[in-house]
């Protein structure tokens, strides 16, 4: 591994302890035109106690695939902020949505459209829980911890594994977990996955638009923590060909009616609605997902919709406990690890709760290529 790529956090520590003299640092984070994250920091004169106190900002969109060079200013509108686990103190990390200079949402800003659906269906109290899988690579783009020029033993001992040779980079995973907890994210768990150096964290339950906000912020923290360890994060749904599991972002969903006794009826109704829009959902469920949804490695076929109780080879899984109790939630196993959560939660709300006149998540996705 290239040692120079790893941050010198021990040297940095003495500077982090310096008095900021009443000012704070706000790190603005946004989604660029490639589905990746960007950020930059600015000084504010006092501690922030409300989102309304945060100023709008701008950046060069021609350098992020979000605007042409002749009209490159893109505006950052703060939508959420969190305690900064890296700078700590009163410093914050700000999630910002991107808007063009005419006030319209940038074509890669899918939050704006999804928020309309959640506002229209506020009384449904739709909850989400996302299971974010990802793969670790070293600075030479080899899977982290794998034998150089070779492969580890076949899958089997790695899922929720314990012990050297079964899990890799647990220190980095733990650091990310703690960073999310410090920032107040609803991170609900972590585990090693089926393929060695593949991990998962879960965020939720979160209501409506907050789900997308929190997943993006958890991803940002993951990348930042990984910087310090000299590790690259991949959200590709099939980072390695062959007999290795892919990476998904299983999406757990419930409405207020589903969570109440007798809610199974509403779960079944939702699954029926989802079956009729399978192709539309797949379109929004991540790029290269065809490499993952093969019907093997705990996935369903990409071309055929299916559902079942406790069946991890189906499109929609109803947990055994939910089937037994008769209410709860369902899991959509189709989304890939590289999804935009605003697209996925938005179309889920649209399908399950109902379409509205001024929002269309399929057309929203198609704006990217316009």
From Swiss-Prot:
InterPro entries per UniProt: Gln_synt_N, Gln_synt_N_sf, Gln_synth/guanido_kin_cat_dom, Gln_synth_cat_dom, Gln_synth_gly_rich_site, Gln_synth_N_conserv_site, Glutamine_Synthetase
Modified residues (N-acetylalanine): 2
The keyword Cell division is annotated on this UniProt entry: no
Keywords: Acetylation, ATP-binding, Cytoplasm, Isopeptide bond, Ligase, Nucleotide-binding, Phosphoprotein, Ubl conjugation
Annotated compartments: Cytoplasm
GO BP terms, alphabetized: glutamine biosynthetic process
GO cellular component terms, semicolon-separated: cytoplasm; nuclear periphery; nucleus
Residues passing through the membrane, by range: none
Residue span, GS catalytic domain: 110-370
Catalytic reactions of this protein: L-glutamate + NH4(+) + ATP = L-glutamine + ADP + phosphate + H(+)
EC number: 6.3.1.2
Further details from the record: Present with 346000 molecules/cell in log phase SD medium.
The protein's name in its UniProt record: Glutamine synthetase
Gene for this chain: GLN1
